[in-house]
């Protein structure tokens, strides 16, 4: 009898958990809505190939629609903010600092659709995002001398990164690095300087070979990779036309051993032999479909990312993602977790 009661109670618990996941009357600040939004943000950060991780800022809208059979479609409109963690950084996004307005913040608006199977708990995620930096006018309105964001391919930014890299390679005996990606550059004032964020990777060359245009240098194979996240400031004038030679600079690079199977180890291969300049803002940066084969509803474990390399399929998003017009929902948009850019 006790076993039967326990079985009934277990069924009620499972049923309650399942029904909470597929509620159709969600408001944007409901816990269930936050769980769906966290799912979408997690996938964005796990599969974003360039730049920095994103943090949830506002759930702008949510709509849960019954689909075919056991499928439920969850449509989300999200506003995210750029953090200071690069996408290759293993730090959980919850522990990443959101880039503040005085440091020229960048926001990202995303349309997401999660197809959820209530029987198998499988999720198919479709995401389309567009990032936009805060306007220069807004930054200067509150802080006239705050650093201004520059395109990562700005000549001063590129030259300054190469200058710092050469200085590092001179000091690191037996270890030579090359730029994997320039993810941020800013023009600073008083004193005038260039602030840089970039990622470097160790290569299988000597210093002499690295300067030989005829010698092919490559990053080490998976499991032997050493990458470093660098934040540097090079003090030089915007009017300088020559490449930096003896300018003062400050730099801090955190070196990370990349383990084979690390959640983002496959992304390093995406960077190798590619353009080392991060894509500029104001463009759609994500357009992917990724199936999730979880067999439970847990939001904690995502080891499958490390076990199986993700295959990206270039395809048009279903029209019902960006063209799905969700009617305004009571309680939406939700609260602002950080700040709004205007």
From Swiss-Prot:
InterPro entries: Cystatin_dom (IPR000010), Cystatin_Fetuin_A (IPR025760), Cystatin_sf (IPR046350), Kininogen_Fetuin_HRG (IPR050735), Prot_inh_fetuin_CS (IPR001363). SUPFAM superfamilies: Cystatin/monellin. Is highly stable to extreme pH and heating, stability that may be conferred by the disulfide bond between Cys-28 and Cys-332. It is found in: Secreted. This is Antihemorrhagic factor HSF. GO terms for molecular function: cysteine-type endopeptidase inhibitor activity. Keywords: Disulfide bond, Glycoprotein, Metalloenzyme inhibitor, Metalloprotease inhibitor, Protease inhibitor, Repeat, Secreted, Signal. Expressed by the liver. Pfam families: Cystatin. Residues 1-19 form the signal peptide. Disulfide bonds join 28-332, 85-96, 110-129, 143-146, 205-217, 230-253. The keyword Cell membrane does not apply. Residues 22-130, 141-254 form the Cystatin fetuin-A-type domain. Belongs to the fetuin family. PANTHER family: ALPHA-2-HS-GLYCOPROTEIN, FETUIN. Cys-63 may exist in a mixed disulfide form with a thiol compound such as glutathione. The keyword Signal applies.
